[in-house]
Regions:
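Collagenous Gly-X-Y triple-helix signature in extracellular proteins
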Residues: 30-240
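Short, low-complexity N-terminal tether/leader segments at secretion or assembly junctions of large
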Residues: 1-31
Length: 240
């Protein structure tokens, strides 16, 4: 059986003859192509680089501002402790919405939790998916968004709050003072805030239950969800 040669001695000095980083990167790309890549903990992978910053989120923010994504792949993650619960925030897409929206988006990484938070929340407390007189956007007046803004955001460590950016999106409108509607009728730009849930189109790459056109907005499917259910299916709690 042939053995693998990794070093050779020349002039009395042992030298590497293979590029470990390139080999590992090629392996990751191969796993991504086959939709089996489960991601790496970026805090571990880039520990020496992160040590030059106050924390891992200051580091990733600096990387994003410089548009330096070398060695960072869709599926990689940064752990966050929220209300004593560990949540692995995965890279869902890199510059997915760069230079889009009515207020052009700069360089960014969108993170989505690998699994669900154990605390559950009902999207709406009534069987009604409409906006109201204060806002025609169903999501913006939903019980879910209220919980994200007023409860879950409070669980974030300050080091995350200091770096997190808001997401802007073209959202569907569904409201009439005459009564409840079953389909959306228009759209408009909205600030989703620091925490949000992906749109149907961002997960499935198509509108299945929403209103064609209005529900899609300017959404694109995040790479992490493309052509596989590996990241679409999430457990209750870390590793659930």
């Amino acid at each position: 059986m042939a053995s693998e040669i990794s070093r050779i001695e020349t002039g009395g000095v042992s030298r590497p003859i293979k590029d470990e980083i390139a080999r590992n990167d090629n392996l990751i790309l191969h796993q991504q192509d086959n939709r089996i890549y489960k991601g790496r903990n970026l805090v571990t992978v880039f520990a020496s680089e992160i040590a030059k910053y106050s924390d891992e989120w200051a580091w990733i923010r600096a990387r994003i501002k410089a548009a330096n994504y070398e060695g960072i792949y869709v599926g990689d993650y940064i752990p966050v402790t929220m209300n004593k619960e560990v949540v692995n925030m995965q890279v869902a897409g890199i510059d997915t919405y760069y230079n889009t929206t009515d207020q052009p988006v700069g360089h960014h990484i969108d993170f989505i939790s690998k699994d669900c938070f154990t605390e559950t929340i009902q999207w709406n407390t009534t069987n009604n998916n409409n906006g109201d007189s204060t806002s025609p956007y169903p999501y913006m007046v939903s019980n879910l968004k209220k919980w994200l803004d007023e409860t879950l955001y409070g669980y974030l460590p300050d080091k995350v709050k200091n770096q997190i950016a808001h997401k802007r999106m073209l959202l569907e409108q569904r409201y009439s003072s005459a009564g409840a509607l079953t389909d959306s009728t228009s759209w408009g730009w909205q600030d989703l805030g620091a925490l949000w849930v992906p749109l149907e189109y961002e997960v499935f790459g198509a509108i299945v239950w929403g209103t064609p056109g209005w529900s899609e907005g300017q959404a694109v499917q995040y790479p992490i969800f493309a052509n596989t259910y590996l990241s679409r299916i999430k457990g209750a709690g870390n590793g659930g």
